[in-house]
């Protein structure tokens, strides 16, 4: 597979995750992460538990339909590091009644059995200064 085709496949994974989140499908969202060995880095903490992360999303963002908000990944930049590894950097915005979140994701993508997954996910949240959100 060419670098362009791999980058397109990675974008498709991210697009499917975004769509799953926006319909409240947390299992579908988590399908983009390597299970069980994904590593999450956020708020100064490292977490290595796929199931605990799914449980966190359901507890914190689930509940009433639509409470998960609307998630968008933008400005997606992909650099192929090897035939089975890529770096992805993107901006994200989560708009929800409980408060908006914006920031940057840095992800290590790995290819296993022909499919791309997020092996390492780093989130850097920034203050949302957009008065329209």
Predicted regions and their residues:
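A solvent-exposed, acidic/Ser-Thr-rich amphipathic alpha-helical stretch
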Residues: 7, 13, 26-84, 93, ...
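Short beta-strand edge/turn micro-motifs at domain boundaries
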Residues: 102-130
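Basic/polar N-terminal segments that are highly enriched at the extreme N-terminus
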Residues: 1-8, 133
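Residue-level recognition of well-ordered beta-strand positions that form the cores
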Residues: 89-93, 108
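A short, structured loop/turn motif at beta-sheet edges
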Residues: 78-86, 109-115
């Amino acid at each position: 597979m060419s670098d362009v085709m791999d980058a397109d496949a990675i974008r498709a994974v991210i697009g499917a995750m975004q769509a799953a989140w926006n319909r409240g499908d947390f299992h579908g969202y988590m399908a983009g992460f390597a299970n069980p060995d994904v590593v999450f880095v956020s708020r100064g903490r490292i977490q290595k538990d796929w199931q605990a992360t799914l449980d966190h999303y359901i507890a914190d963002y689930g509940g009433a339909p639509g409470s998960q908000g609307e998630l968008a990944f933008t400005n997606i930049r992909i650099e192929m590091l090897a035939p089975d590894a890529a770096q992805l950097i993107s901006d994200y915005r989560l708009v929800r009644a409980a408060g908006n979140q914006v920031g940057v994701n840095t992800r290590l993508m790995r290819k296993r059995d022909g499919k791309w997954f997020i092996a390492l996910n780093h989130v850097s949240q920034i203050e949302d200064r957009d008065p329209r959100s």
